[in-house]
């Protein structure tokens, strides 16, 4: 067997076996200490709290009433915290491929529901890099139609595709927020592009990902990547810190932010520092670019900034933008950074012409005010309010 194939299979096997064991007995080496609000923890059974393995806290980026997906939900601690954050009108879905961890979470599901007064958590069996395939459904099909020969294997592949299409584990555009806590680094390198594509697929337009994970300040050398113990311990599979952000960008996210970065490394191996970061990224910049004579002015403090579509905004300059970008820049995480300038006469979008978003250009004020705008007005009152003169 080629070395690369052997390493891939051994790393996957090591992850499964180590976390299956950790579902039965706590393993401190898998844990990067994280503190959560005590009132959220009080309803969660001790067995789950003792089997929690994470490195960050993405819960502050989840809102009441939202549908939230937890990738690699493990014993369910984060899901049970989120159940209280989203409340009775919200919904939490946990996905994990480790049956022992999934069993631990499901075993205490009703207990937590009784304690908080409602049931809004669902644990599903699947791979986080393949959120279309429901492994519980696949398992039931295999019980009735086991694979005995190559022909059966081909039939199985067709079955998988049918299940992905007809009964996806997580449908397209169905989730407001995707969270994960120290799990993405456990996914094989060759599956990571699909992993981020799946996160993007399941999010609603305007939704966000809030991901806590371990990153490295340097490339992890091959001999460390081949170590199953280090891989399953969230070390040798760690993303390089800049590549982690690039993965979100390549998947189509925008507004990508490192909202928390551990100052001191969690571990150092052969001089390479490994630490926890939490990244928030948004979905919603895709779509047609239409000209509505709108403009934005970047307030500063930087001399200029560039967005994820390559638009450049010099400080203080009135820049032309399409209708989509105009509204995007007024929402988080950009809100407060730009002044938005509406045209004096609105252009209905069904009458708007295409806007060329491939280049950045300044908007002539007459485009928003109109060439026939020659109004002269008197002072409308103190320009700085009632506290004193404006100069």
Named regions from a protein language model:
Residues 193-208:
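A short glycine-rich, Lys/Arg-flanked "PGG" loop and its adjoining helix->strand segment in the class I
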Residues 215-235:
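Short, glycine-/aromatic-enriched active-site segment of Class I SAM-dependent methyltransferases
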Residues 237-252:
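Short alpha-helix
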Residues 98:
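Conserved SAM/SAH-binding beta-strand->alpha-helix loop
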Residues 31-67, 78-81, 85:
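Conserved alpha-helix/loop element of class I SAM-dependent methyltransferases that forms part
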Residues 251-391:
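C-terminal lobe and adjacent flexible extensions of AdoMet/dcAdoMet transferase-like proteins
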Residues 105-106:
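Conserved SAM-binding loop
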Residues 135-142, 153-178:
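A short acidic, Gly/Pro-enriched loop at the edge of an enzyme's catalytic core
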